Amino acid sequence: MGPSGFGSGGGLIILSPDTLDEGHGAAGFRLTYTRPGQRSDIKLQALSAEGIDAHNTRYNLNASVGAAYGITHQLTVSVELPYVRRDSLRAAEEGELERLGDVSGIGDLSVLAKYRLTHGEGGGLALIGGLKVPTGSTHRRSPDGERLETEHQPGTGSWDPIAGVAAGTKLGQFGLNASALYQWSTMGAQATRLGDRLQGGIAVSRRFGSAPGAHQDGLNHHHGDEVDEHDHEARRASWDGFVELFGEWEGRQKIAGEIEQASGGKALWLAPGARFNSAGGLSVAASLGVPLWQRIRDSHPDNAYRFSLSVGKAF
């Protein structure tokens, strides 16, 4: 999902209700490599002959940088800017296959605010709101000079509101977090309105080693909760193990007022991972996600797997 925020979710996808201390900040880098299922040229052409404009890539890459700042103890604001690459894009239209090459560029900026409703240790609850801003290019062209469809561009051209909620609690030595984010797509480039998006699930984590003085576990969400947020007391290096179970849904897109019936889909993912937290506040996390179940409509390929890597630093 596009937007990223900061909080200690225990994993790389699920948000937590935690916020940064007032006046504290963090910066991070996140890399996501998604491998789709591979469909042959013949399969794409056959779908196109049925009126389905199907496409495939070799892989999709999202490399993003982000930062967060604690406005107050309850309110944290974060931004994330991605670089997007779609490798070896192939698309079929009216029975003809086109090799559109590699598509890459700066994507759309996401801005999120997280407001924590609860205080102190134990369970927590936070509300999340934000906006995806159309900073990405929408004018990439094929080798023949034809402008690519909006869904293949690095950017969308649309201003998309985002809203969500995050909750968390401790269960003995384990941390449990749950979150959901919804993104409303508005009209973007080339009279295209991409499908709305929903992402939500749960994360279970366990810390090995200790980090004294951190009254909350970290910061970060899509950059991963790879950074501890509090520097009041000395801390020691530690490891976290985590497992995330989450779902993703994408609605059908609309072009020039016409709904693309074969677009969109939904999937359920399982993503185990680990994170190393250094004594100096630098953290590195990685996870490998595999789809347990998916129903992707024919214009898009199924998912094979997703690898995520994140690095972050609190200050």
Residue locations for each model-derived region?
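Surface-exposed strand-loop-strand hairpins of Gram-negative outer-membrane beta-barrel proteins
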Residues: G2-G5, T32-N62, A92, E151, ...
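Extracellular loop and loop/strand-boundary signature of outer-membrane beta-barrel proteins
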Residues: I14, A49-D53, E94-G101, L148-Q153, ...
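Residues on the lipid-exposed face of transmembrane beta-strands in outer-membrane beta-barrel proteins
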Residues: S16, A27-L31, V65-Y69, V79, ...
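Repeated loop/turn-to-beta-strand initiation elements of outer-membrane beta-barrel proteins
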Residues: G25, L75-V79, V111, G120-G124, ...
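Transmembrane beta-strands of outer-membrane beta-barrel pores
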Residues: L31-G37, L81-D87, L117, L131-S137, ...
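Outer membrane beta-barrel transmembrane domains
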Residues: S40-A49, T192-F315
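Long, hydrophobic/aromatic-enriched structural stretches that serve as scaffold segments
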Residues: I52-L112, R116
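Residues that define the transmembrane beta-barrel architecture of outer-membrane proteins
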Residues: T57-A63, V103-L109, G123, D144, ...
